[in-house]
Amino acid sequence: VFAFVLLAQLASGSEQTQQAPSAGTAVVELNDTHPELFNELLEELDERHFVKIELDNVFSAQLLERFLERLDGGKNYFLLADIEKAQSQWRNKLDDALKQSNLKPAEQLYNLWRQRALARIEQNIALLETPLPLPEQADTAIEFDADKRSWFSSPAQADAYWQLRLAEQLGGLMLADKTAEEAQELLIKRYRNQLKRVEQFNATDLFSSFANAVTSIYDPHTDYMSPRSEENFKINMSLSLEGIGAVLQIEDEFTQVVRVIPGGPADAQGILQAEDKIVGVGQEGEDV
């Protein structure tokens, strides 16, 4: 399996200053470094990736589909009219925009998604703060599989879907031995946390979403990592084997054993030693 990770060194200096927009404005704007960074991403893919892809109308259509999937793969927020407008505007034009270092289409689509998501989550919280009728058995059929559902044809259809979905979620929690009040409080907390996460999304998140929509066209194992994502990746890697009884850290491109914890599984086995470098992880009998 070929894995190709692109690290955004150019953005590392500016990411610390990225601020999430206020919920009221619901606008995320890319800065002047992002087009340059995106050009570097395309150059890296063209020069180093084994898959060669032309920036043409086929690429444009794929990119639009992948980006919309990343934004709202569950078909929870966009309306059919939003999708149709996006396809009309950008299906055959994203490639032309990228050739001109124009990331405004990504900005436009991301902010529309953000606007729809914030409005929907706020509406869900408002609904949950009033008593919701639990659906009767005959009325509980709801299709959660986005592949089997169409986009909402109207705000009214979206409202009806979400009212039923919230009632289903409440019912599910009550079946798990929550009282109606406890279920209501728990769901409100979940949606408030979700609202906070969306409010905190910033230009780095926008850029990463669009960049990864591009890299996914090349292959599913090609990823763009922002400096923050790279840091989280390193943290996760450094902690991934601590359960075996060893303290680990990232050293250059390898995970290195800092020390073996006395009495732990690694100490009992006697194979792993301090300063060993871990180049792969596998189950017993597997090739690494």
What are these regions (language model features)?
Residues 1-9:
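Bacterial N-terminal signal peptides
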Residues 12-288:
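Flexible, low-complexity junctional segments that flank or bridge functional domains
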